[in-house]
Amino acid sequence: MASVKKFSNQAVVNQLRHIERTITSPKNTDIIPDREYLNYSLIPSRGISSYEYFKQRKAELYCYNRKDVKVLAGWIVTEPKTLFPHQQEHFFKIVHNFLCERYGTKNCIQSIVHADESGQPHLHFCFIPVAPDLKHGGEKICASEVLTQSELRNFHPALEKYLNENGLNIKILTGTTKAQGGNRTVSEMKLEREQIYSMDLCRERW
């Protein structure tokens, strides 16, 4: 149901543009241009672009001066097939709130629902992975301390509990979800191959 990927600084611009659909010739063949109007953001307008906000927030944090530092992370959460159409907006709003509480509202760079692709609608939630900086004081960018193996292992159970507590009695911990990160169609798995790492792959690399 959900998977995550990390991005280095040089990949941030293209990732944000891809999610905002501002790339002139996108490589993702699953995008249906006539349905782009169905996409929507869950973040109130900040008066600046998401990239400008990213730079502002990043400047407030300690960050190691290395090209391989992962300065952005992105969860993609897919709408369950058992969800009724009238529940969709409520579902994504709850998921957005869950992620903001988990990773910090001011660290959220983008939160956009895509409904213009084949397969199930899904939420892209991009954030700066921020952790306490015990050495320098304040906060630092550190994906390895935020997206730990424990965090990845507990993500789905915590999300299911949060959904249930907020009025959506959705079971997402099926056998497939536990093993592969979600109940996915062929097109959804193709989407994941192009845009995200699976939960198991994340565990192996992190």
What are these language model-derived features?
Residues 1-206:
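N-terminal nicking endonuclease/strand-transfer module with a His-rich metal-binding environment
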